[in-house]
Swiss-Prot record:
InterPro entries: aa-tRNA-synth_I_CS (IPR001412), aa-tRNA-synth_Ic (IPR002305), Rossmann-like_a/b/a_fold (IPR014729), S4_RNA-bd_sf (IPR036986), SYY-like_C (IPR054608), Tyr-tRNA-ligase (IPR002307), Tyr-tRNA-ligase_bac-type (IPR024088), Tyr-tRNA-ligase_bac_1 (IPR024107). One of its GO terms (biological process) is tyrosyl-tRNA aminoacylation. L-tyrosine binds at Y35, Y168, Q172. This is Tyrosine--tRNA ligase. Catalyzes the attachment of tyrosine to tRNA(Tyr) in a two-step reaction: tyrosine is first activated by ATP to form Tyr-AMP and then transferred to the acceptor end of tRNA(Tyr). It is found in: Cytoplasm. The keyword Aminoacyl-tRNA synthetase applies. Homodimer. It catalyses: tRNA(Tyr) + L-tyrosine + ATP = L-tyrosyl-tRNA(Tyr) + AMP + diphosphate + H(+).
Length: 406
């Protein structure tokens, strides 16, 4: 098998390919141009979006040429794949802002490998399409019966599929055709939920007289408990630091289940397979810490990863640097007559509402300086402060907040 494909296969990326042997043979002959796409339906990617981007970086490191297609055109419609209902329609200005933000995130991640990557936006060729010409030239090559056989459409037919979304496959296929004609793209990569759209694009190129092209999909990553990875109790694990802090990002990976550590290291780091196996054969908590550090460094930079590591060590083991912990500032005057435990945890951001804070205390999950507080009427005063006028709050097993009173 071709070296680049073997890397992806050994690290657990590959799910399906239109013709893996033929693709391998083609890549053995020399550099291949390939693309992956992402729709800017939000201001930030989350970690679940990153599997194709990690694969792109692997391929670029092996000398192949990548294109990242930002779907400024397709996002005006919305992809029904994996969705149970129609997406909220965003304004064109919102989509343009999101596209710029997502491109910056990917550029930062690619770092020096960006020299092998081009960014394009499909609104450049989709925004002003003539509908009649498009139906004649492109729509005539699609079978509605075949489209409805794909899982993405079958699922949505049960809950309601708009005609708007039904057009998405034609537009994504047209993207592949345009990239093939203009940039000699021969390979499309993406998540396995895109399989139907990718195969349709390959078929369109063949029907339009193009050469052989390929579709390669990657597994949709799940955790050991069967849940889709990339989510936490607070929601998606976004790359944008305004949405998820580097510390919380680090903690998501640090809290990986034992059974997932090696799999996630293979997919979300560039450590060698030999080193990964060696790390995972040792202390599992050290392996989790290494996983968290490596992924955080790749996404947010080494400096932020080191801060997050120090903060985690300060919170969990009493070592490290307290300054790197998540920190909130409250007025010292709140402690003069005592602040209620429920108010304290709510104001510290460890509970989204006072009702949540109350439940936390009642269920035995509220700690101050590692002392459990189970009385919902407890008043917290200055006796809980350390010499620096600080206290450490803990919610449950893994969420900490350093409170500075001034």
């Amino acid at each position: 098998m071709n070296k680049a494909l073997k890397i992806l296969q050994e690290r657990g990326f590959i799910q399906q390919c239109t013709d893996l042997q033929a693709l391998s043979d083609r890549m053995d002959k020399g550099q291949i141009a390939f693309y992956t796409g992402t729709d800017p339906t939000g201001p930030s990617l989350h970690i679940g979006h990153m599997v194709p981007i990690f694969a792109l970086k692997h391929l670029c490191r092996e000398g192949h040429k990548g294109v990242v297609l930002v779907g400024g055109g397709t996002s005006r419609i919305g992809d029904p794949s994996g969705k149970t209902e129609m997406r909220k329609m965003l304004s064109y200005d919102e989509l343009d802002k999101n596209a710029a933000s997502i491109q910056k995130q990917i550029e930062k991640f690619l770092a020096k490998d960006i020299k092998n990557v081009r960014f394009v936006n499909n609104k450049d060729w989709l925004a002003d399409l003539n509908y009649i010409d498009f139906l004649r030239d492109i729509g005539s090559h699609f079978s509605v019966n075949k489209m409805l056989s794909f899982e993405a459409y079958k699922k949505r037919m049960e809950t309601g599929l708009s005609f708007l979304e039904f057009n998405y496959q034609l537009l994504q296929s047209y993207d592949f055709l345009m990239l093939n004609q203009n940039y000699n793209i021969e390979l499309q990569i993406g998540g396995d939920d895109q399989w139907g759209n990718m195969v349709a694009g390959s078929d369109l190129i063949r029907r339009k007289g193009g050469g052989e092209v390929f579709a390669l999909t990657f597994s949709l990553v799940t955790r050991a408990d069967g849940q889709k990875m990339g989510k936490s109790e607070k929601g998606a694990i976004f790359l944008d630091t305004a949405l998820v802090s580097p510390y919380d990002f680090f903690q998501y990976w640090r809290n990986t289940a034992d059974a997932d550590v090696e799999k996630f290291m293979l997919l979300f780091t560039f450590l060698s397979i030999e080193e990964i196996k060696s790390v995972c054969a040792g202390d599992i908590n050290k392996a989790k810490e290494r996983l968290a550090f490596e992924v955080t460094a790749l996404i947010h930079g080494k400096e932020e990863a080191e801060k997050a590591l120090e903060g985690a060590r300060a919170a969990f083991s009493g070592g490290g640097n307290k300054d790197a912990m998540p920190t909130a500032n409250l007025s010292l005057s709140k402690l003069n007559e005592g602040i209620g435990i429920i108010d304290l945890f709510a104001e510290a951001g460890l509970a989204s509402t006072k009702s949540d804070a109350r439940r936390l205390v009642e269920q035995g999950g509220a700690f101050i300086n590692e002392e459990k507080i189970s009385d919902i009427k407890a008043l917290i005063g200055k006796e809980k402060l350390d010499k620096d006028n600080e206290m450490i709050l803990r919610a449950g097993k893994k969420r900490f907040m350093r409170i500075i009173f001034s």
